[in-house]
Design a protein with these regions (language model features):
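Active-site C-terminal subdomain of aminotransferase-like
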Residues: 201, 213-216, 223, 228-332, ...
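Conserved PLP-binding catalytic core of the aspartate aminotransferase-like
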Residues: 29, 34-36, 308-315, 322-356, ...
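PLP-dependent enzyme catalytic core of the Aspartate aminotransferase-like
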Residues: 68, 72, 76, 80, ...
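Active-site phosphate-binding strand-loop segment of PLP-dependent enzymes
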Residues: 162, 166-219
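C-terminal segment of N-terminal export signals and the immediately downstream linker at the start
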Residues: 1, 21-47
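N-terminal export signals
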Residues: 6-25
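Conserved N-terminal alpha-helix of the aminotransferase class I/II PLP-enzyme fold
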Residues: 79-119, 314
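Conserved PLP-anchoring active-site segment centered on the Schiff-base-forming lysine
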Residues: 130-148
């Protein structure tokens, strides 16, 4: 009889062998629908469409996605538990490793409890459902620049929803005054970091307004986890905010280098999610992702110097862009975006950089505007020389 570990090892080896043999075919199939296909994991140097590039895209802020210890932890989880539980968490689908993710997240965020979800995209609907069930709000007020995972789900609760001008606390106050009915409490929903331009939301102002009306704030903090705050706990820590009226969720796929969503908080808020539709109606997360998440959080806590390096790289990138003539803020967010006179100009610069072996993003993502933008991201693992090369090539083209 073939042992469980032996079977999993053989199956994994076979899949890897098949994947390598079929890489060209798969790339061709995907290439018919997507312009770019990554042939290696995100790192300062990455292979795209079969060519090696200096890579300034995505959200792998610490390149944990290719860190040997993270990969080893993912492999062990896969060998121990198989690919997934093939059922929901509240049936038989809770592996011990999922509980360990939640325990580690509580430690990382300094929270009483946490719930691990299969995807970061689910954090907002899960959070909204919990807060609504607990009676924390009766009407939602959403920053119009919020991520799609907020705007896609904000009407699902069948509660009144109002949008306010992007990053504008005064408009938020006006909308609440005009629309909140007597006895109602507002929920203000926003990103912590808006992903395209890397701007940090004015959360202290949002919070003051929400508190004035006995309301609360919910943040999609996917881009801030690991990046902002002394301990990498995100936007609230960055601003020094603490209150039982502040709630958030995030992803483990960016700074942490794994996959899945995480909502830290007190047990009152976590319990309705643990027993709710998002958890009951979905398969549990991939075991390898859980193993990677635990190791990613451990590395984040053990190596705060990585965050300091990330901030240094962010300062170098933004200072260089300012010298070229592009307006940039002074935040430690390692994301910078800028526009040129026309979409055609941005297409040209993007193409020329690709020809010179440098990959940045030509983005039309949330908040990019009708012509889109050019966007560059630095990792903690980029060298000063690599960042200088990007800046030098960009300056020559604009």
């Amino acid at each position: 009889m073939v042992g469980r570990r032996s079977f999993l090892k053989t199956a994994t080896t076979g899949l890897v062998a098949w994947g390598l043999g079929a890489k060209q075919v798969v790339a061709q199939l995907i290439g018919s629908k997507y312009k770019f296909v990554m042939d290696s994991g995100p790192a300062p140097e990455t292979t795209i469409n079969g060519k090696r590039y200096l890579y300034f895209g995505g959200t792998g802020y610490f390149a944990f996605q290719t860190h040997p210890e993270v990969i080893k932890a993912a492999q062990k989880a896969l060998a121990d538990f198989g690919t997934c539980s093939a059922t929901s968490r509240n049936v038989f689908g809770t592996f011990p490793i999922y509980l360990e993710v939640e325990k580690k997240a509580g430690e990382f965020f300094g929270a009483e409890d946490a719930i691990y979800l299969p995807s970061g995209y689910l954090i907002n609907i899960a959070g909204f459902q919990s807060l609504a069930q607990l009676g924390k709000f009766q009407a939602m007020f959403v920053d119009e620049g919020a991520h799609w995972s907020i705007t896609d789900f904000m009407y699902a609760l069948q509660k009144p929803v109002y949008t306010f001008a992007h990053g504008d606390p005064e408009d938020l106050d006006r909308k609440i005054k005009a629309n909140l009915k007597p006895g109602e409490k507002p929920l203000v929903a926003s990103d912590g970091i808006f992903p395209t331009f890397g701007k940090v939301a004015p959360i202290p102002d949002y919070f003051k307004i929400a508190e004035r009306y006995d309301g609360c704030v919910w943040l999609d903090d996917c881009h801030a986890i690991g990046v902002l705050g002394e301990n990498g706990r995100g936007t609230y820590e960055y601003y020094g905010l603490k209150s039982p009226r502040l709630y958030f969720g995030g992803t483990l796929s960016k700074a942490i280098g794994a996959h899945g969503g995480i909502i830290p908080g007190n047990t009152e808020v976590v319990l309705p999610i643990r027993t709710g539709h998002v958890v009951n109606g979905a398969n549990s997360s991939v075991s390898a992702a859980a193993g990677a998440a635990i190791k990613g959080m451990e590395l984040m806590m053990a190596h705060p110097e990585l965050r300091q390096q990330l901030w240094r790289n962010a300062r170098q990138l933004k200072a260089g862009l300012k010298k070229i003539g592009f307006d940039q803020d002074d935040s430690p967010v390692p994301v910078a975006a800028w526009t040129l006179k026309s979409g055609e100009d941005m297409d040209r610069v993007h193409q020329k950089l690709m020809e010179r072996g440098i990959a940045i993003q030509r983005t039309r993502y949330v908040g990019a505007g009708p012509n889109g933008a050019l966007r560059a991201v630095v990792f903690a693992t980029h060298t000063p020389g690599q960042i200088d090369r990007l800046l030098g090539e960009l300056k020559a083209l604009v």
